């Protein structure tokens, strides 16, 4: 099987299964998914709290539990992303695709516009790809990787705020408030970032199912067993 070394396009058969996503990458994917399932509802409630919480105040710690769940999930989210960055250096080529987009090559751009036309249903593109196709790779980097980094930085800054100026957390993260003007702006941007990543997640799920149905390769299965398998031969 012949594969383009830069874009990952399958150029010629005979086709054979390819081990694409290593176990740490697959584990990271599902850990981040679970963390987001906690972060989104708790983050929404923190940003838009209920007007009142019933019950005896001495026994009601409802909002404290919400904050605690958000903070724990956020730390898992941040540590998992840091480990994912580390694995990009020590893992296989597909593990680096999330962070390195080969925009300097013509074959990548050809695949990018081919996939864009296919997703818009204006042209038929039957290329096969090992790992992410160029359009998916660009979206994963520009929307998910950068969006996740933004959420981690602003989230750590908001977490540090409770310690007060002059403390070690604020000495490390206080520059974020200086950069964006004030804590309220950071809080607003962090809240908007939640909707941004949630929108990406919806689009991501749609594209994954679409690719698994319409493309010539397994997509959902590869994130469970790591293997990319093929349903047809590559285009001539």
Where are these regions (language model features)?
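Membrane-embedded alpha-helical bundles that constitute the cytochrome b-like, heme-associated redox core
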Residues: 1-236
């Amino acid at each position: 099987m012949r594969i383009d070394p830069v874009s990952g396009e399958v150029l010629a058969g005979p086709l054979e299964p390819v081990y694409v996503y290593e176990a740490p990458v697959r584990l990271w994917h599902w850990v981040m998914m679970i963390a987001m399932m906690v972060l989104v509802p708790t983050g929404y409630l923190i940003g838009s709290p209920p007007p009142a919480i019933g019950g005896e105040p001495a026994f009601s710690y409802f909002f404290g539990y919400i904050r605690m769940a958000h903070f724990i999930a956020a730390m898992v989210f941040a540590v998992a992303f840091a480990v994912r960055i580390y694995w990009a250096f020590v893992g296989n080529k597909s593990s680096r695709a999330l962070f390195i987009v080969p925009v300097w090559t013509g074959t990548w751009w050809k695949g990018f516009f081919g996939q864009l036309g296919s997703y818009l249903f204006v042209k038929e593109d039957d290329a096969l790809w090992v790992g992410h196709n160029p359009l998916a790779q660009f979206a994963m980097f520009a929307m998910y990787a950068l969006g996740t980094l933004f959420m981690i930085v602003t989230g750590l800054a908001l977490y540090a705020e409770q310690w007060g100026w002059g403390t070690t957390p604020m000495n490390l993260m206080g520059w974020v408030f200086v950069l964006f003007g004030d804590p309220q702006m950071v809080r607003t941007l962090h809240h908007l970032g939640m909707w941004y990543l949630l929108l990406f997640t919806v689009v991501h799920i749609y594209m994954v199912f679409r690719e698994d149905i319409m493309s010539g390769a397994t997509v959902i299965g590869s994130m469970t067993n790591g293997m990319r398998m093929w349903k047809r031969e590559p285009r001539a």
